[in-house]
A protein has these predicted regions:
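Sec-dependent N-terminal signal peptides
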Residues: 4-12
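A generic structural signal for short, non-catalytic loop/turn and secondary-structure boundary residues
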Residues: 7, 44, 134, 374, ...
């Protein structure tokens, strides 16, 4: 242990002295000779040998003889089981199944593998022999009062030949007699369940309550919940020491692992798995394993892409001993004692990849061979030899070098209007921040025709005749052509756009919903479990004592009035302003906003921060009777222009700045990447006629607003993001903005018989992005370019966001 600490400490000191000098300004993300650069400067340098498996592996199990490993893969595309030969280190079977979500366990002799059926509300029973899986049977967990179960964790009870399953929709524990195919007992611990394990004496079962920040202790003698034990937020995977004295559980929302004394049923220690003890949340520890003698605990930090190692030989005195770099979003880790190796399931794989087979609107296709960004990320299994002290030191140095906030240097900036780093003072010149969130456009779709930017005009769908205000704004102010949405779809998009983070619940459940495998859209205040512990930008504003006004973000509707979906939003949400509803024009939203704005101005009570939702650029496709695609885009564009004009002609203009983003890019066409998107910054202190090629992300926007308002960073992502400073000037230009009236009819309706009209009728447009995006983009393309048009093949790097 002392050797580990000395080596690691020395390497950290060296890194601190040299890293700033070695950082290079690399313009674009992608794979280099030595690492993969992600959009915000984080790097991937995965250790060991890496084997391709299915999409988004969620769990990992291996046989006692260490010949085989099996992963459950629960991505947006195919759900599957991957069987890996650990002698040859190859995937030997990929069994596609209808639905699965995490749960895996063997029976006593490993002849049967039990697999969670997710929202099918069943457990699959597969025979397993010589590395091959075959479906044998299934166990139906539904009872008369269950509408939806959603099976998550599983464990086998050898003494009774029972199966214990837990769920995240019915929030229940199911004890099942396998031989009799009979549900013996159903227990209700009170919140969403993630994992279930038995102690070694088979006296108790323990269930991590994902949404409850507790562990449920189940007495296996009377099959009752004996007590609930408090731990950290979003408890996920658990381990119990061989002597049944300590339970370890990862807290995904807290950068931590809770250690529970099972004799006293109390948390006695909390281990911080982040690289630095004082950094914000965002590491997302979600899986753990022991080494052979249980002296070392290994923790998989999903959003940091590394394993954290701790010496736990002395209870209550755990010590960090190093880190191991792994792949993208590690979701499971296991230790092979016979081989002294580690197995790591990487949810997003290893590298960004090209997307030459992206959707080609204009061609008839079943989409089976197309690549969609939500299913481009093939998982991998890393096989890593357990490192000695020297190797662990080298790995640790690599992890530190991969991490921007450790190597953070003060941004170079000539301007003095916005602080360059987080402090509590904020900007002395800018007092009012307006944040406008729109829906789902790529850079090339809207601005690809602007010659001074890095655009592809052949991919531009909405030229200046449709989006005259967008074009005028980026010509008058600054054009940003290297901005990337942190998110994939609206589920995580509205979280990344407001929290610089999407919780592990959001990341692990949106592929289920968007893959058509059940679930509900509950990521905008619909369920408490979806919220990050670090909160949202409005929490920071309110906690700072600043005023805030919310228009349409995270709201729910009742009898024509809109209220905040979260308690803290209720008093600051304008009840007349609609949320996401494509039947309501953005022109109406502008009218409602303007009435409130003018009233606030008249009272000299304009809030420091306003969040305004403008969703019409999502469009309704070619649904008969709905506004045409161009009409909805133009409606959105004009509303944006009118908002900018109204602010610029107010007495608050000199002290104002406006940020405009798309929550995600909807997998649209873009010659750089499907996540490159439209971002605008507007105000007197924004440079005019300037082009900023700096790489920015959604988290960059949040960080810049934090710097202006004197707020603290919410997560590691806004902490390490590049602030938008290159386009800021000390010399204000108070010229106001005149909006450009639409050049097309905003009331134009889709006629019958348009390409995709019938499919648009069938699509769920009541919920953000609850449509098959490949098909929806094809409809958009043909509606604009013509029914016979064909999008030429493009290459798109397929990174999802900053680090994941």
């Amino acid at each position: 242990l002392k050797v580990y600490i000395i080596i690691l400490s020395s390497l950290i000191i060296l890194t601190g002295c040299t890293s700033r000098e070695s950082i290079k300004d690399i313009k674009l993300p992608g794979k280099t000779e030595n690492y993969t650069l992600l959009p915000n400067g984080w790097k991937l340098t995965p250790a060991g040998e890496n084997i391709g498996i299915g999409e988004l592996p969620m769990n990992l199990i291996f046989t006692k003889n260490e010949k085989y490993a099996i992963t459950s893969n629960s991505g947006m595309g195919d759900n599957s089981l991957s069987v890996i030969d650990l002698i040859k280190n190859i995937e030997i079977q990929r069994l596609v199944i209808d639905k699965t979500w995490r749960g895996l366990c063997f029976n006593k002799d490993e002849s049967i593998l039990f697999v969670s059926g997710g929202n099918n509300d069943i457990v699959y029973c597969y025979s397993f022999s010589d590395g091959k899986l075959d479906l044998k049977d299934s166990l139906n967990l539904r009872t008369g009062d269950d509408n939806l179960i959603s099976v998550t964790g599983l464990t086998y009870w050898p003494e009774k030949d029972y199966l214990i399953a837990v769920s995240m929709r019915s929030n229940s524990i199911y004890i099942f007699d396998i031989k009799k195919n009979y549900l013996i007992k159903k227990l209700s611990p009170g919140s969403e369940c993630f994992d279930v394990i038995l102690d070694h004496q088979e006296k108790y079962a323990y269930v991590s309550l994902w949404g409850g920040a507790k562990i449920a202790k189940v007495n296996l003698e009377n099959l009752e919940i004996e007590r609930l034990i408090k731990v950290g937020d979003h408890p996920c995977e658990m381990l119990i020491s061989k002597d049944d004295k300590r339970l370890f559980v990862t807290n995904a929302n807290n950068n931590s692992v809770s250690v529970v004394d099972l004799n006293n049923n109390k948390e006695t220690e909390r281990i911080n798995s982040a690289l630095k003890p004082d950094v914000p949340y965002g590491s997302t520890p979600n899986a753990i394993t022991f080494n052979t003698d249980e002296s070392v605990l290994l923790v998989a930090n999903a959003d940091n892409n590394y394993l954290a190692l701790f010496n736990i030989s002395s209870p209550g005195e755990s010590k960090s001993i190093g880190f191991i770099p792994v792949g993208w979003y590690p979701t499971s880790v296991k230790y092979l004692p016979g081989k002294n190796q580690l197995l790591v399931a990487n949810g997003k794989g290893l590298i960004s990849m090209a997307n030459p087979k992206g959707p080609k609107p204009g061609t008839k296709s079943s989409h089976k061979d197309e690549q969609f960004v939500g299913s481009l990320f093939k998982g991998t299994l890393s096989i890593i030899n357990f490192p000695d002290a020297k190797q662990l030191g080298e790995y640790s140095l690599q992890v530190y070098n991969n991490t921007p906030y450790f190597n953070e240097k003060k941004p170079l900036s000539d301007q003095t209007i916005i602080p360059v780093t987080h402090d509590e003072k904020g900007s002395g010149k800018i007092k009012h921040v307006f944040y406008i969130i729109r829906e789902n456009r790529t850079y090339d779709q809207v601005l690809g025709d602007i010659s001074k930017g890095n655009g592809d005009s052949s991919l531009c769908l909405f030229h200046s005749n449709v989006t005259p205000n967008a074009h005028k704004i980026v010509e008058d102010y600054t054009l940003f052509d290297n901005f990337y949405a942190d998110a994939e779809i609206s589920a995580d998009g509205h979280n990344w756009s407001t929290a610089a983070y999407a919780s592990d619940y959001t990341e692990k459940t949106w592929p289920v919903f968007y893959g058509g495998r059940g679930g509900t859209y509950d990521w905008e205040g619909g369920k408490a479990i979806a919220s990050p512990s670090s909160g949202y930008i409005w929490n920071q504003v309110i906690n700072k004592g600043l005023s805030y006004r919310n228009y349409g973000e995270f709201v729910k509707e009742s009898e024509g009035k809109y209220s905040g979906a979260l308690s803290e939003l209720i008093p600051v949400t304008y009840e007349k302003y609609p949320g996401f509803d494509l039947n309501i024009k953005d022109q109406y939203r502008f009218k409602i906003w303007k009435e409130d704005f003018e009233n606030l101005v008249a009272k000299d009570s304009l809030p420091a921060f306003q969040l305004i939702r403008l969703p019409s650029d999502h469009t309704s496709g070619t649904r008969k009777g709905a506004p045409t695609i161009n009409a909805m885009i133009a409606d959105n564009d004009y509303a944006l222009g009118q908002i900018v004009e109204t602010i610029s002609k107010s007495k608050y203009w000199k002290e104002s700045i406006i940020f405009v983003v798309e929550d995600d890019a909807q997998n649209g066409s873009d010659h750089v990447d499907a996540h490159r998107s439209v971002m605008m910054v507007i105000g007197p202190y924004v440079k005019k006629g300037f082009v900023d090629h700096t790489m920015y992300t959604t988290s960059s926007v949040l960080k810049t607003m934090e710097l202006i308002l004197g707020l603290k960073p919410m997560t590691q992502f806004d902490l390490s993001a590049t602030p938008i400073l290159n386009s800021i000037t000390d010399i204000p230009d108070l010229k106001f903005y005149d909006s450009v009236k639409p050049l097309i009819d905003l009331n134009e309706k889709n006629r019958a018989g348009l390409f995709g009209g019938e499919r648009s009728e069938e699509m769920n447009l009541a919920v953000e992005d609850a449509v098959p995006e490949r098909e929806f983009n094809e409809i958009l393309w043909k509606a604009i370019k013509g029914a016979e048009s064909e999008l030429p093949p493009v290459t798109r790097s397929a990174f999802i966001r900053d680090i994941k």
